[in-house]
Each structure stands twice: as C-alpha cells, then as structure tokens.
C-alpha cells in the first residue's frame, strides 16, 4: 500500500526534530528548474501569481533566492516535520515511533508543487508553490504541465519497489490532479470523510483535511497493506459507511456531537 497526501502552506522549522535520519528528494533537478523560473519573478509578480500579500510575496521571493539543492539539516528539515497544516495535525508525526518512520518512508508520499513527490524523511527548504499555480515554464502554462507524468512514474517505481497493489488517495483534488491516474499500476482507493451538520452528512474542509492525516497515521501505525483493512479506521469518532462505499471510494462518517 502506498498513500498520497498533500503538503501544507503552514511550515514548522522551529520544533525540535525527533530524529536526524534523512534522505534527499529524488527530483531535485526538476526543482532547480522551477526555482530558476521563480527567481525571475519580482515580489509583486509573486503576489499576483499566488494571490498572496506583498509581505508573503517578499518572503517567498527571498526563499527562492536562498534555495539550494545542497540540502542539509542545517538549512532544511524532513518534509514530515516541516509541514504543519490540518492534515499534519491529524498525522501528528512528532509522536510516531521509530519503526513507524521506517514504514512511512516506504508507504507514505507527499505531493509537492516544488519537489514533485516527497518521502517523509526527504529534506526540504521552506517554500510556497502550490500545485495549482499557473507558473509559465518551458513545458507549459502551469505546474501540471511542468510535472507531466514525472510524478506518476516515480509513484509507479515506489509501488513496484514496495510490492504495493493499492494506491490510497488522501490528497486534495488540487494535488491529486498531478497524478496521471490512468497510468498508475495499482488499484486506486479514495477515502471520503463526511461530518454531520444540521442532520446532513457532508465534506467539511477543516475536518476532512485533519481526517486525511488521521487516516495516514492509521495506515502507518497499523502497517496496513490491504484496502479491506482501511475500513477499520475509527479515529476521533469516524466509522465506515458500507452502504455508500464501493471498491474505489470508501466513505467514513462522523455523527454530530450533542
């Protein structure tokens, strides 16, 4: 089993790292090409392109200039600890055990606008470059065209190396769109998380993001290999909804708290 999650805009480069074990991203030459494009942008152009404030644009212009492919623990940190959004609150990587990291390194992947596909212990410098960014480049007008099938090929390599027959899509639509689904050499399963509100079950973004992280943690802690085992997921009140699920989409519901 190989699980895909999205990165986060919020980053943490302050907390004490629980391990110094690390690896390097495998598509750094592609990252360098993207950085070269980004370095040509002014802060105001970045603000317009990314729809961010001038302050955030200036910070990221500086990050693009400072970026290097010579990654070390002195200038970077492992992706699983660097990301800090709702998904990573659910994942809670800082409280995983040593053997969990070994499993995660083989069975969890983070999609990334800048790095393409990250393993948990791959080092990364702070950046902001969302997959949906319409960054003009030599391969097209956006990052989907830039990455083309490179991310997909690497996913297939990982599936083969881990003898995985299942790809679990717990990434956002924006990031999963970078995967050429028809070229994936595995059964694809997508967990969907519905929360009850005013008597109706629906996807509530904040809860769904955290639930994706909880599912990633569930897979890692239980060393899951089969899609059937995902149905046992019951973190924080979620339960499997057999009636509304099928072999491609597993629905999990959580009832409204009184």
Curated annotation (Swiss-Prot):
Gene Ontology terms describing biological process: response to hydroperoxide
Pfam families: H2O2_YaaD (PF03883)
UniProt GO cellular component terms: cytosol
Transmembrane segments: none
Domain of life (superkingdom): Bacteria
InterPro entries in the record: YaaA
Family (UniProt): Belongs to the UPF0246 family.
Alphabetical list of NCBIfam families matching this protein: PRK02101.1-1 (NF002541), PRK02101.1-3 (NF002542)
Annotated protein name in UniProt: UPF0246 protein ACIAD2218
Organism name: Acinetobacter baylyi (strain ATCC 33305 / BD413 / ADP1)
